[in-house]
Amino acid sequence: LSAEARARTVAYLPQSRQTEWQLPARTLVMLGRFPHRQMFKAPSAACEAAVDRALSAVNATEFSKRSVTTLSQGESARVFLARALAVEAPFLLVDEPTADMDPYHQIHVMEILKNVAKSGVGVLVVLHDLTLAARFMDKLLLMKQGQIVDSGTPKEILTAGNLEHVYRIS
């Protein structure tokens, strides 16, 4: 696949979500539409609608005109998630989506990701919070030092033996 085709196929939310750009949150989310836009042209109505849907999905519409440099870490994380959602790709890769969030927003983000998956998007989440993984994930892939230890449902994976082996907790 070409880089452009990959960009339309897989959306990515990195764990590191800092920016020094002093631009409105909505503009940052619009960057997610880059693979769908024509160079040097104004965003289409479809792009604007995709950005609206993404901002609404993460409850970020109210601060979408603020500079991303003025947002709290939790607000910023939601805006970056909106950027990934705005791609409207068939696959979404997400690295630690709930980092720096209070419990309410952690649950809200996980519900968003669950709904995205229910809509038919393939969602792969890297997550170290076992409680959130057990509550929201249908399937888990348990890894230790880059190697797959086990895979299956949360009930199958989150066993005392696996937790002892991978996390040294009992």
Outline where the language-model segments fall.
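A short, surface-exposed alpha-helical micro-motif characterized by mixed small hydrophobic
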Residues: A133-R135
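H-loop/switch region of ABC-family ATPase nucleotide-binding domains
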Residues: L127-H128
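Conserved ABC ATPase "signature" region
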Residues: M30, A45-F63, E88
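Conserved ABC ATPase signature
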Residues: A42, S67-L71, E75
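ABC ATPase "signature
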Residues: S151-G152
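Catalytic Walker B motif of ABC-type/P-loop ATPase nucleotide-binding domains
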Residues: L92-E96
